Structure formats: C-alpha cells, structure tokens
Amino acid sequence: MASSSSNRQFSHRNANTFLTYPKCPENPEIACQMIWELVVRWIPKYILCAREAHKDGSLHLHALLQTEKPVRISDSRFFDINGFHPNIQSAKSVNRVRDYILKEPLAVFERGTFIPRKSPFLGKSDSEVKEKKPSKDEIMRDIISHATSKAEYLSMIQKELPFDWSTKLQYFEYSANKLFPEIQEEFTNPHPPSSPDLLCNESINDWLQPNIFQSSDERSRKQSLYIVGPTRTGKSTWARSLGVHNYWQNNVDWSSYNEDAIYNIVDDIPFKFCPCWKQLVGCQRDFIVNPKYGKKKKVQKKSKPTIILANSDEDWMKEMTPGQLEYFEANCIIYIMSPGEKWYSPPVLPPTEEV
C-alpha cells in the first residue's frame, strides 16, 4: 500500500524507468494504461507490465517504462496507482530489466515498441554490435538521457570521454548543475528573533516594512541599511534573524549566491575589500560578478537590499571619497549607534524576594 515515507530529497530523472509495486494484485493492462496517462507530457514510447507471485503467495507488479524525454519528478508518490506505492528505479540496462520482468510472469501486458539499449558506455552485447563508432554528440545524448544524478553524469563522461573530462571538467560540472539542480531544503532560521533596544526603533521599523517584510513592485528599487557601532551589541544576530539571506564575512564569495534570498548581509568587511559595493548598496539588479575559481555570471534578478554591518574602527564612510559618500547616503539608511544601544532586549529578571 501507499508508503508513508517523506517526499523530501527525492528525485528521479530518466527516460527508462523500472517500477515495482509490492503486494499489488492490480491487472497489468489497467496498470499500464494508468502509468501511460501519468507520463503523457514526456511522450511515452513503450510500457511493459507483468504480475508475478512471491514464494509466500503474495502478488506484486513490475513495470518497465520508456519515454522519448526523460521523466523528471521530485514527488515519490507520482507513480502511485489505486493506493499502491512503487519502488522507483532507473533502468540502467533496459534489456536486462525486460528479461527479468518476463522471467516468470502470471500475466503480461505491453504497449508501444520496445527500444533496446544501445549505450556505448555499457559495452556491446551480441545484439548491440555496431561497426560505426558513436560520435561525441551521440555519446553525450545518451549520457544526458540516462544519467540519474550529478555524480553518475560526471562518472559516465569520465569513462567515455576521458580527455574531454580532464580538459573541460568545469563545463561538464556547469551542465551537471543545470541538469541536476540541488533540492532546496525548507529554510529554518537558526538565529532567534530579537527586539532591538535602541533610542530610535522607529527608523529601523520604517526601513524593515518596505524592504524586508513587504513584497513590492518588481520595477521598484529597495533601499539598503548601514549600521555602524561597537562590537558585541547583537548586530549580526539581529540582521540574520530577519529571513533567508546571503551572508558574507571576511570576503564576498559569489559562488554560493542564493537568488531566492530576501536580502544580503555584508558583515565586518572593510570598504576597500568589498567588490561591487555600489551594486549591493544600490540594490541593483542583473549585474555581472566574477566568482573566485569560477566563470563570470549575472546575479540579482530583482532588487535586493543589503545590510552592511561595521564596527566603529572600520566605518565605511571614513574611507569614501565625497562622490562615493554622496551615492552611499542616497541609497542607504544610515544608523550610527549611540552608547548603550543594543540589538537585543535585556532579559527580564524575576523579582527578588525580600528577606
């Protein structure tokens, strides 16, 4: 019956899919038609369903599915039929999977035309001998169609195209990231919310509402926030508690930039070591950056505010030219902390009992 396992982190991508429905007495013909309808968008070419009996007498169902385009799903329950949940695998050798399904079936149904595997990287069986050597395009097309993960994709390329793999690895890694993007986990904020103990909370609240908490027209530009003050006053914890963000400390590393972040944080980085400071402070969109050890890329598809945190001894404004300072003040709310201010409220102590 349907499994209760979580859908998180599940991913399947392949043009050849092998399904096993345990303890499933479903009619193979009915199951074939239901699975066929589920994958219409990927252009199904062939499906084989067979009912088989276990030694204990229980029935289970096997299915081999072949599509023109790779089936790409992230829902582990996608192939559930009539409450029965299958084990979903990539059929790396369709010939062997088909032979396995047809070994001892009680009932069989198939639709479409079976496509024998002609993969150059699995070796050649007697029925797959080809005099003509496959081209690089054919090899890559086959790898793209049958790889099920980033690691498998790169491993196949290394095996079949070793010279290209050794000289163009960064390009293959780039295509692997596009084919198999990482599944984003649901954001859980590790930083507890805090209430600033400031002389002028209103100015911070006035900045928070339109720039962090409220969605705005994509054409409008946000405004950044600059906070300068003593260390150990809770600036970083407060800034990081507001939501999903890009966080940089010591240096700005664009290689892990998250487009889904609501805002950026530049924490304790001297002004002279902050590249693209104008783009960050000005909440600009679609600008080019050059990640270390990576290729140039365009980031920030929409206007995104930046919170800049600095200690008094590295005040950015002291390092700026008059022209830079004018730009900074026009695009940034500036908050200079007063003595005694903190970005968290002091704990409320219980009243002491009189002795």
From Swiss-Prot:
Protein's organism: Maize streak virus genotype A (isolate South Africa)
Cofactor: Mg(2+); Mn(2+)
Primary localisation category: host cell
Source species taxonomy: Viruses, Monodnaviria, Shotokuvirae, Cressdnaviricota, Repensiviricetes
EC number(s) on file: 2.7.7.-, 3.1.21.-
PROSITE patterns in UniProt: CRESS_DNA_REP
Taxonomy, superkingdom: Viruses
Quaternary structure and partners: Homooligomer. Rep binds to repeated DNA motifs (iterons). Forms the O-complex, which is a Rep-DNA complex involved in the initiation of RCR. Part of the C- and V-complexes which are RepA-Rep-DNA complexes involved in the c-sense and v-sense transcription.
UniProt keyword list: ATP-binding, Covalent protein-DNA linkage, DNA replication, DNA-binding, Endonuclease, Helicase, Host nucleus, Hydrolase, Metal-binding, Multifunctional enzyme, Nuclease, Nucleotide-binding, Nucleotidyltransferase, Repressor, Transferase
Motif segment (Nuclear localization signal): 292-303
Pfam families: Gemini_AL1, Gemini_AL1_M
Domain CRESS-DNA virus Rep endonuclease: 11-114
Region (Transactivation): 252-270
Chain span(s) of sequence motif RCR-1: 18-21
Family per similarity comment: Belongs to the geminiviridae Rep protein family.
UniProt-recorded name of the protein: Replication-associated protein
Localization: Host nucleus
Domain notes: There are 3 rolling circle replication (RCR) motifs. RCR-2 is probably involved in metal coordination. RCR-3 is required for phosphodiester bond cleavage for initiation of RCR.
